[in-house]
Amino acid sequence: MKDIFNFGSGPSMLPKIVLKKIKRDLFNWKNTNVSVMEISHRNKNFLKVIENIKNDIKFLLSVSNDYNIILLQGGARAQFSGIPMNLTNNFSDLADYINTGYWGMYAAIEAKKYCSVNIIDVIEKKDKLSILPMKNWNISKNSVYLHYCPNETINGTAIYETPKFKNKIVVADFSSTILSRPIDVNKFDIIYASSQKNIGVSGMTIMIFKKNIFLKQNKFTPSILNYEIIYKNNSLFNTPPTFNWYVSGLVLKWLIDQGGVKKINNINKIKSKLIYDIIDKSKFYKNNIYDEYRSYMNIIFYLPNKKLNNLFLKLSKINGLLFLKGHRAVGGIRASMYNSMTIKGAKKLANFMKYFEKRYG
């Protein structure tokens, strides 16, 4: 069987060693004679899974004791509602939302249902895309919190700058970049990330939040989105997707075995450089983002026309390079290079790009 590499934006590929472990556990998890999908979420073995996930997140991101960690059901999009409902209690409360692209804007649109929103555009379009430095963000003095998305999967942009806003609650959607590079958690009040890119399979969102941050909750906040209630119930306010959480636990152990976040960050830089170098040396492939704002996780590039774009997708699939089609909003090609993507996979894509340009350029 030839090597297959999944460059999809999420759900992403999983490490082979994790897939093999899942296969072994599928019918008899921890000598219980049942699958992990059948086990009670109150079972002592599964309670240990939850504890391990939290401890491994703390270890990998150096999370201090000033923060709590909860596991939420569903994707990050639900938190576009949950965040304003847990931080504001009426429409007169103001929140700053940074428009970094598709997801940053979508979060702002959802928040408007619960509070006043000040949308701050930070994307600059000249010859290429760039992002305003944080010191030039027009933050409101009286806003309750600031929300932004450090990595935009659709636009292929990233913000690597660390926030330094005084007396401001800083909230960040790290869904597509969590655990891919070191971050200073202490510079944030709330970090949340869905699991289907760098943490496991879809169905879970991890949230790290500063203790006592939720002091102004909307009285209409559903209990299932009330972060304090979820924390007090050990993330078990209702039955969780046990299999999803189990897989996330395996992926976190795998990342620790790889050497942690610093080591995987170096690998991610190598992978992305293999692709960006080809783009930058080529007159055939185009990327419209300045280097310092390019995402390591989601590489966007364009071919000269739609016909070549479609041919690239067809032939790449035949060669075991899957799910490279760009998002419908921007088109082109998107190569998502999450933690589980190997250097071997990145090299295979790079070699295919060279071949395709030589053959059709």
Curated annotation (Swiss-Prot):
Pfam family, one: Aminotran_5
One GO CC term on file: cytoplasm
One term of GO molecular function: pyridoxal phosphate binding
Compartment annotation: Cytoplasm
E.C. code: 2.6.1.52
Residues engaged in binding L-glutamate: 9, 42
Reactions this protein catalyses: O-phospho-L-serine + 2-oxoglutarate = 3-phosphooxypyruvate + L-glutamate; 4-(phosphooxy)-L-threonine + 2-oxoglutarate = (R)-3-hydroxy-2-oxo-4-phosphooxybutanoate + L-glutamate
Binding-site positions, pyridoxal 5'-phosphate: 76-77, 103, 153, 173, 196, 238-239
GO biological process, any: pyridoxine biosynthetic process
InterPro entries: Aminotrans_V_dom (IPR000192), Aminotrans_V_PyrdxlP_BS (IPR020578), Pser_aminoTfrase (IPR022278), PyrdxlP-dep_Trfase (IPR015424), PyrdxlP-dep_Trfase_major (IPR015421), PyrdxlP-dep_Trfase_small (IPR015422)
Cofactor: pyridoxal 5'-phosphate
Record keywords, A-Z: Amino-acid biosynthesis, Aminotransferase, Cytoplasm, Pyridoxal phosphate, Pyridoxine biosynthesis, Serine biosynthesis, Transferase
Residue numbers bearing the N6-(pyridoxal phosphate)lysine modification: 197
Chief subcellular location: cytoplasm
UniProt pathway annotation: Amino-acid biosynthesis; L-serine biosynthesis; L-serine from 3-phospho-D-glycerate: step 2/3; Cofactor biosynthesis; pyridoxine 5'-phosphate biosynthesis; pyridoxine 5'-phosphate from D-erythrose 4-phosphate: step 3/5
PROSITE patterns linked to this entry: AA_TRANSFER_CLASS_5
Cofactor: how bound: Binds 1 pyridoxal phosphate per subunit.
Subunit description: Homodimer.
Described function: Catalyzes the reversible conversion of 3-phosphohydroxypyruvate to phosphoserine and of 3-hydroxy-2-oxo-4-phosphonooxybutanoate to phosphohydroxythreonine.
Similarity-based family: Belongs to the class-V pyridoxal-phosphate-dependent aminotransferase family. SerC subfamily.
NCBIfam families registered for this protein in UniProt: PRK05355.1, serC_1
Protein name stated in the entry: Phosphoserine aminotransferase
